[in-house]
């Protein structure tokens, strides 16, 4: 598969592979020299391909000893599921490429993968995606809004988790993030999911019992359920 690039002028995906063609963005005022109709906007592209879209991103977390740890996350757009994460102090293109195999074993790979233009995604990473039959979608320079799901996910992790803890090291950060993602996937509700969690929660009526409070993420958050006495 090829690589889609986002045009910095109108936000429309552009491709370097003739097997995937997305022309000028809708609303640009012209159908192009070929006379072909204008394509979907970037927002429409995200909506129309949500079932086959994933995005990746890195963010950093400092430790108590002033080391900087890099967290790599893989997010499936459908139901906002975090499908994989890992932590390292020294990320490389080879390490990042290996994470994609860990995230999508066998035939579970998405059709498109959205990422920014960081140099960490080198030849090794791009070759791995090509072998997995994944088309890269590159965001325009300095345009984090074009990768909204991943950016929002990183913001949630910071605000709801790592900004409230002192990280001791890699193992400690993995344990913290595992706890947070258990909460995020199974308990945290989303307006875009009709106030459901990424892993669907069963609606409990009053007949199910009294409401009980279950601490999660070391007490930073709580899950509320009904439980029979």
Residue ranges and their predicted role:
Residues 1-229:
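Charged DNA-binding/catalytic regions of mobile-element recombinases
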């Amino acid at each position: 598969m090829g690589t889609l690039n986002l045009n910095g002028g109108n936000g429309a995906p552009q491709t370097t592979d003739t097997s995937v063609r997305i022309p000028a963005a809708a609303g640009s005022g012209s159908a192009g020299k070929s006379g072909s109709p204008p394509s979907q906007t970037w927002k429409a592209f995200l909506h129309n391909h949500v079932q086959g879209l994933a995005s990746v991103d890195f963010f950093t977390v400092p430790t108590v000893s002033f080391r900087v740890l890099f967290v790599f996350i893989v997010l499936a757009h459908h139901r906002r599921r975090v499908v994989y994460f890992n932590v390292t102090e020294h990320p490389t293109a080879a390490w990042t490429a290996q994470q994609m195999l860990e995230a999508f074993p066998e035939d579970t790979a998405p059709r498109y993968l959205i990422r920014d233009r960081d140099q960490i995604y080198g030849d090794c990473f791009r070759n791995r995606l090509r072998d997995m039959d994944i088309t890269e979608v590159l965001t325009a320079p300095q345009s984090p809004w074009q990768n909204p799901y991943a950016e929002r996910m990183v913001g949630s992790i910071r605000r709801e988790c790592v900004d409230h803890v002192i990280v001791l090291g890699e193992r400690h950060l993995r344990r913290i993030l595992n706890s947070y993602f258990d909460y995020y996937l199974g308990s945290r509700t989303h307006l875009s999911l009709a106030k459901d969690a990424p892993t669907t929660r069963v609606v409990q009526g009053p007949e199910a019992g009294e409401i009980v409070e279950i601490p999660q993420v070391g007490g930073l958050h709580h899950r509320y359920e009904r439980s029979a006495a």
